[in-house]
Each structure stands twice: as C-alpha cells, then as structure tokens.
Amino acid sequence: MVTEAKPGSSAWFSHVEAAEVVSDPAAAAWDVDVDVVVVGYGGAGVAAALHAAEQGLSVAALDRFNNGGSTAMNGGIVYAGGGTAVQREAGYADTPEEMFKYLKMEAQGVVSDATLRRFCDESPGLIDWLIGHGVKFKAKAFPGKTSYPPLDYFLYHADSSLAGGYTAVSKPAPRGHKVYSAIHNKTGVGFGRALWEPLRHAAERQGVKTFPPAEVRRLLVDPQGAVVGVAALTFEPGSAAEREHARYRRTSTKLLLALPPQFPGGKFLWKLAARYSAKAEALERAHRVERRFRARRGVVLSAGGFIFNRPMVEALAPKYSAGMPLGNPGDDGSGIRLGQTAGGAVDRMSHLSAWRFLNPPVALSRSMLVDARGARFCDESWYGSAIAYEMCERHEGKGWLILDAGLYRQAWRNVLRDKLLPFQRDPVVLALLFQRRKAATLEALAAKMGFDPVVFAQTARAYNDAAAGQAQDPFGKTAADMSPMGEGPYYAIDVSITSRLFPLTTLTLGGLKVEEETGAVLNTAGKPIKGLYAAGRTAIGVCSHLYVSGLSAADCLFSGRRAAADMAAAVN
C-alpha cells in the first residue's frame, strides 16, 4: 500500500505543516503586513521581489539560509538569445524564432508553444533588465563546443545547437551568457554571486525587506482557500543566536560542497557537515520565534527543488539516487510541499536532469559511448544533459566510453595542455587513471566488459563507417566530430551514474504546476489558487524536460518576473 504524501506522513519528507485557516485575515494579528511575500530568495525570488517592488508593491523576502540559493552558487550562466545586446556586440545574428525552434526540440511540450515563444521574445529584454540592475556581461564568444567556457570567454554555445541533428532544424547561435566579475574571473568559481548580488542590492534600493534566516513552515489561508500569508520561524535580528547559526550553516554548506559524496573522503565531509547542521538546528529549536506575514497580493514560492532532500529523491526518483546532487541545502522540497498544502498539484517529480559532459576534453566526445550491451545510444557531441537523459532513462544509467590508443593519448594531451577548469579536468584525470579497463583487441574488451560480442562488433563497424563518411550516423553525429577505432590497446571508461570518480551531477526538474500566463499555482482540478504563485525550480518551467546551461537561471528570472507582473496587475 502506497502512503499518501501529506504533512506528518512517512512519505512527506518535510517539516512543512498543514495550511492554517485564518477566519478573518483583516482582523487577525500580523507581525508584518505587505503586498507580496517571497519564500526563497535565490534567482527566482530576487527577480520576483525586485520586479514587484519596481511596480510599487511592498515586498518581504524570506529565506532559511540567506545565501542566494543555487543561483548564487552556479556558474553564472543565463541562457538568452533572440538578438541580445551581448550577441549583437559579439557579431552574432540571432532571432526569437531560431531560439524558439531550438528550445522546442529540448522542451518537448513541457510548456505550451505560447509560453516558450514568450520566453524567447522576452529574452533580449531580460538581458537589458539585468544590465540595468548592475549585472555585467562581456561579448567575447567561444566558438566551439564545451561544457563551460574558458575564463576569458563570456558567450558560448551552452546547448546542443552545434550538433548535426539540431543544425538541420535551427540556426545555431551562442546563447550562454556568462556574467563578468573581475574577482570571480581570477578564481574561476562563484560567478553565480555576480548574477544574484547586483539584483539583491537593487531590490534593497527598491525597498524590499529581508529578514534573519526564516523558515516558512505553514501557509495561511482564508476560509475560501485563498492564500493570505505565511507563518515563519525566525531569529531575533542581531541576536547572538542568529550570528552563531549563520556560522554553523556556512561551515556545513562549505563541507557539503567541498567534495562529491562519491569521492574518497566525500562521505566523511558529509558526515562532518551533518554535525554542524545539527548544531544549527539545535539553535533553531532553542531560539527561533514564529512571525506571521500577511501577503495582500500574493505569496511567491521560489525555494528551489529537492535535490538535497536525499530521502525524497530516493523515494520519488530512485534511478537518479546514485547521482551527485547539484544545488544547496535549501533545495529540500519545502517550497513544493508548501504549495501542496494549499491544494497545489505537482508534476514530473520523478524527472531529474543529469549531466554527462564529454567535452572537454574533446577527445572523449570523438569516441563512442555504449551501454551494457555494447550498443551506442546517442551523439556523443550532444550537451551533457541530453546524453545523460538517454543513459539514465533508457539504458539503466550505464555507459562506457570506448577509446583506441590514439584517442586515449589525445585525451591525456587535452587534460594536460588545454585550459580546463578543475571541475572539467580532475574527474576526467581520475577516470582515465582508475575507472578504465584495457584490452589488446575490441573482442577482448567486449569479453572483459560483458558486452554482447555481436552487438559490440556491429557497433564498432557502424561507427567506423560513419566516421569515414561511408554511412550516415543513426544519431546524426557528423564525421567531423568522430574518430574511427584505430589500433589498440582499447579502453572502456566508466561514465555510468554509479561512477565514483567521474560523478554524474543531478538536479530536480519537477515541481508545482502553474498557470503559464501568470505563474499562479494550479490545484488538482487545474484551477489557479488565489494568492499563490510559484517560480524557479519550485515550479514546472521551460527547463523541466531537459536542461541546458543557464536555462534554469533564465527560467528563474522569467518566472519570478512573471509572477510579480501578475500581482502588480491584480485589482485590490
């Protein structure tokens, strides 16, 4: 018997409580009374707060960690196109129509064509809005395929648009806009802060009120079910407990992010992080007080996904539970659960994005990737999430790269000579050293790996024919992106989801269903819930089928601003 997911049940995996009915909101006692309450202050939350304040609404922003969420921790990429100012300065002609044609292939109907067109049409204006609020970009473009551009490049192809199967449908253009920061450009990390912090400062100038770390436990609804506010647990501003709590949380987060849990030493660091998190939680139990926030226009749930709620991932998306979580401890599913307590419907909760990047080093993308039978299943030059989707959804998360002696040597040259960032280089080095098997012949490699010998031999022959231009590759990979299997020895590199030293990063894409015109949360009957909105990874959005670099951040900004615009337009 399946346990229903509701507050207090074993399938809930959350501290979120049932919604509380406020019989008369006008007569109730409120600690804070504003037009808009934003729950979760990362990319989507700050976009909603800032855009609402720009239109004259009063805003209170609440966040349990006050660290910018996953947006502040990401690579600082915003997926944008249609002819942005940055694209034009770099000399690239892009249109909303070409952007739409490409994203339609990736979105696969997860949002309507009308919403996808709106996203593309508004994309140039989004970049202008970011620039207007102090976010900096540069127009130096990287022309080739890569998972992430070198430090001195700021515009790149952040998707599969250069792959053969896509160029036949849509004209490619570099749409990955990396923010510029002189400080972060020296270290190669922290670019996401250069996206989030200017928006946070702009929101403060517009009068957005922020509070000490605040955990929203309950939605407050009127007798008709409309959301009228939230109940949050928070510290007294400036208290010693607040400062100590922040210190424990910072330490815990740093330890969690220091190493993937699969790496040697990773589990130890995660256990150490749990100790600091427990100290923070003890302070929360001892010193927090409840405050009630009224939201006259609406509550925006923008608290991220649930990738760091490991029991929730294991229950809802077990095929991805071996992957490396990408996000922050605030991605615990609380925003989604809050929406459900008001009757909100969810979708795609078992759908995650995973990334198996094979370039850089470019040598890996020129090899062939096979499953447990020894059969290919994708174009190896695709964007990492497209490769991982095929591997995890259709091939049990199993994958091995097959390299001949020449490609193996080239891979080493790539990692030693090319300007790779540590997160691009180090896992590949470890995989080449410790996650490989070697054999003198392809037949011997098949036997060692347990491949079907007939299937593997046919795969290798077909790959060589396509690489030589003698046949069409069934996955659309161009001969220019392929290297035929030459002389041995031959290598099989483990790139499966269970690979300990070459982790597969994962991110949840499911969430609350929303009315696409407004961002209002929909109930199980498909009707909007008055006073409740969702944005970013708390909601279903443009990237909820297949992620490409910067698309989640762009969707956070788009959906946050969409919710703010609807609340500003609402009649009191």
Predicted features and spans:
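Conserved redox-cofactor binding core of oxidoreductases
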Residues: C120-V289, A467-A492
